[in-house]
Amino acid sequence: MPRGKLIVIEGIDGAGKGTQTELLARAFQLRGVPFVRFSFPRYESSFGHLIASFLNGDFGPLPAVDPHLSALLYAGDRFEAKADLEAALNSGQAVVTDRYIASNLAHQAARVPAERRPEFIAWLRQLEYGTYGLPAEDLVIYLRVPAKEGHRLVGLKSARSYTAMSRDLQESDLLHLKEAALVYDELAQTPNWVTVECFDAGSGKHRTPEEIHREVLEAIDSRVLSHAGK
């Protein structure tokens, strides 16, 4: 049986990852495409509980937490899910994830001085893909929005299970989101990434979820499903 494809939806906070993951799941259901859906971090996991504490500020303000340590929490959460990820892929199902390794790379590297980022990213890639042996993505869809717009949209979100705050530790820091967006832009140069512009700078408006979804689906059809015997 052909191995399934790992499709990841990425972007800074407020980019619309949850919405696009849901729309993609509905599209796959309508098409009869077998798939399994994941969302990281998984706040119910043992590492996820610690991530929630980190995002709630229980370990101190963002600059007080070494990014190597916070990176270990997010990587550990994925490592706990590795068996489920591999089982789904080995059964031939598509795996759709809302965030994956790139989120860790972007958000933790954003807190490292620019001159040290390449070294940090190399270390974290080795940890997640090498030491932990997590499966590599077949396609990463990068939902690109300006940090200021993402920050605004986060404020419109409904309550989340892991925090009572309207914005968690990372979401509340606009400078952090700007730096994370810069790292994402660098990561997006990777061949298996597709960038979807979600904000129309000309009109100053966010594109509709349906417009974005059509572009996401086109990328998946051309880059992944067309090579999987669709």
Model-derived segments and their meaning:
Residues 12:
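P-loop (Walker A) phosphate-binding loop of NTP-binding proteins
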Residues 9:
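Hydrophobic anchor at the beta1->P-loop junction of P-loop NTPases
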Residues 103-182:
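A glycine- and Lys/Arg-enriched "phosphate-lid" helix/loop adjacent to the NTP-binding pocket
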